[in-house]
Amino acid sequence: MNLTLGALNPIAFNLGGIQVHWYGIIIASAVVLATILAVQEAKRRRIDPDSIYDLILWALPVAIITARMYYVIFEWGYYQNHVDEIVRVWDGGIAIYGALIGAGIVVYLFCRANWIPVWLMLDIIAPVLIMAQGIGRWGNFMNQEAFGRITSLTFLQSLHLPHFIIQQMLIDGAYRQPTFLYESLWDILGFIVLMSLRHKKHLFKQGEVFLSYVIWYAFGRFFVEGMRTDSLMLLGIRVSQWLSVILFIGAIGILVFRRKSMRERLPDYLEGNQLSPK
């Protein structure tokens, strides 16, 4: 195989002197697609579609800020000497767990204020969220980040990867494990599984689609994170791996507890929104 092409340009085009990055285009596309699918499902679950748009307008900027804050905090050794780069999110450097923390707080407050069951809203969001995560990893691909350990060209070719992926994994003179791809495929598979199962009658109580998402994502992220070389570290520990373990165990624990102790009181996911303002 002739591998003569260089790395892909992370900049898509220039607009009036402003560089538009593929990273931003890919993330924005993922958000738009996720919003469209969430609106469609909200209608089926008796939630005003405008609520989804309003929620996105609040949650998205908060998620971006907390995702960046999370990343900067764990990379403070670098950013304390490069303060001007803290706001440069278009260059990459946002953490999904940070985004989930910020967005989760917004979802809770928004739903309480608008008479929407929090668990139901999380169920609606979960499948499209993991889809957006899977798409978003291709932004990391364009920036040549979220890659894994050094590997060989022979190994990458054995995976039957397209030429452009193999060449993009040539970083600093060495081929790298395409961990972005592993996680992207895992996320997209999770999206397919959740979308296939969530409309099964009496299968999910409200909250269980979301908890299934957490279990699925945390399980895959733990193993992918172990292959990466750019993990955020704290006291020599991969932060995302520990968070994955906590979320995996926690979600299973909550799922079992709710099924055993609250099963008869939990509405089915398909029942949709049963709340109304007083």
From Swiss-Prot:
Record localization: Cell membrane
EC numbers, comma separated: 2.5.1.145
Primary site of residence: membrane
Alphabetized InterPro entries for the sequence: Lgt
Keyword terms, alphabetized: Cell membrane, Membrane, Transferase, Transmembrane, Transmembrane helix
Membrane topology: Multi-pass membrane protein
Name assigned to this protein: Phosphatidylglycerol--prolipoprotein diacylglyceryl transferase
Gene Ontology biological process terms, A to Z: lipoprotein biosynthetic process
GO molecular function terms attached to this record: phosphatidylglycerol-prolipoprotein diacylglyceryl transferase activity
Binding of a 1,2-diacyl-sn-glycero-3-phospho-(1'-sn-glycerol), residues: 137
Record NCBIfam families: lgt
Membrane-spanning residues: 18-38, 55-75, 90-110, 115-135, 177-197, 207-227, 237-257
Family of the protein in this entry: Belongs to the Lgt family.
GO CC terms: plasma membrane
Pathway where this protein functions: Protein modification; lipoprotein biosynthesis (diacylglyceryl transfer)
Top enzyme category: transferase
Function description: Catalyzes the transfer of the diacylglyceryl group from phosphatidylglycerol to the sulfhydryl group of the N-terminal cysteine of a prolipoprotein, the first step in the formation of mature lipoproteins.
Pfam families: LGT
